[in-house]
């Protein structure tokens, strides 16, 4: 009779729920064996579910594949809402039918998985571009226009250049055909890939700014208006990376000028 360890090693090789190996092992009454069978079945089902989820997130890409297009860039940004730091956009071209396990809207990926999935995108992407527009430009042109500039910069870095753009809720004035998708980072794998690249890139920048400007908790809040950030603003004032067109930073700057 096989040991439970041997059965466990055998089950790792099973890839289908209908495998005859399950039927054979289910005759074994040992609770440890039954536990391993259940565990492996759950793992196989999870893999099937994940594959279906990834498949559903390729629907926009597959429509474009049918038209003979393969160089499809997903575009997304991170950092529209913070009081400090840049807006960062990424453009990513994935290989045809590329599925990266765990890839999703960056807001839905557990923080501890960010770097792992970011690295998987880096490893598998055909091309990646990153656009960073700082707070001074944001204050000059407004955050909406700055976001467009960041996206255009990211796209300009792609080589080869894309045949079509899938963009998260935005239209760009570029001579490339494009599709604007509401909640694109949750509905397109290409946009989701751009989402995690932009997110990790910006988070790393904000960690560097946290070293440069301690007291605002930038490493944790990424420039968003958390209680610790607002406390830092009150105690320490405005830094060179704060967006002076955003409240409450704007009022703090005006108050300082008037005093």
Swiss-Prot record:
Disulfide bond sites: none
Top-level taxon: Bacteria
Entry-linked Pfam families: RNase_HII
Domain RNase H type-2: start-end pairs: 70-258
Binding site for a divalent metal cation: 76-77, 168
Documented EC number(s): 3.1.26.4
Gene Ontology CC terms: cytoplasm; ribonuclease H2 complex
Catalytic activity: Endonucleolytic cleavage to 5'-phosphomonoester
Keywords: Cytoplasm, Endonuclease, Hydrolase, Manganese, Metal-binding, Nuclease
Cofactor list: Mn(2+); Mg(2+)
Gene3D superfamilies referenced in this protein's UniProt entry, alphabetically: Ribonuclease H-like superfamily/Ribonuclease H
Signal peptide: none
Cofactor note: Manganese or magnesium. Binds 1 divalent metal ion per monomer in the absence of substrate. May bind a second metal ion after substrate binding.
Cellular compartments annotated: Cytoplasm
Role according to the record: Endonuclease that specifically degrades the RNA of RNA-DNA hybrids.
PANTHER family hit by this protein: RIBONUCLEASE H2 SUBUNIT A, RIBONUCLEASE HII
Protein name (record): Ribonuclease HII
């Amino acid at each position: 009779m096989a040991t439970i360890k041997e059965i466990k090693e055998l089950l790792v090789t099973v890839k289908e729920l209908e495998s005859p190996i399950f039927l054979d092992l289910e005759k074994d009454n040992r609770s440890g064996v039954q536990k391993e069978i259940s565990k492996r079945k759950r793992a196989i089902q999870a893999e099937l579910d994940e594959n279906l989820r990834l498949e559903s997130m390729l629907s926009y890409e597959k429509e474009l594949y049918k038209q003979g297009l393969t160089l499809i860039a997903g575009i997304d940004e991170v950092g529209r809402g913070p009081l400090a730091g840049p807006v960062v956009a990424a453009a990513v071209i994935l290989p045809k039918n590329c599925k990266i396990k765990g890839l999703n809207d960056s807001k839905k990926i557990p923080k501890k998985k960010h770097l792992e999935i970011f690295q998987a995108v880096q490893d598998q992407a055909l091309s990646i571009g990153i656009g960073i527009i700082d707070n001074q430009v944001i204050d000059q042109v407004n955050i909406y226009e700055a976001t467009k500039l960041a996206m255009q910069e990211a796209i300009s870095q792609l080589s080869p250049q894309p045949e079509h753009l899938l963009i998260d809720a935005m239209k760009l004035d570029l001579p490339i055909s494009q599709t604007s998708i509401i909640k694109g980072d949750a509905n397109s794998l290409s946009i989701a890939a751009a989402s995690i690249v932009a997110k990790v890139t910006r988070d790393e920048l904000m960690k560097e700014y946290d070293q440069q400007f301690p007291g605002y908790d930038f490493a944790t809040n990424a420039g968003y208006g958390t209680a610790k950030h607002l406390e830092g603003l009150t105690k320490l004032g405005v830094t060179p990376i704060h967006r002076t067109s955003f409240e409450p930073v704007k009022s703090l700057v005006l108050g300082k000028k008037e005093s």
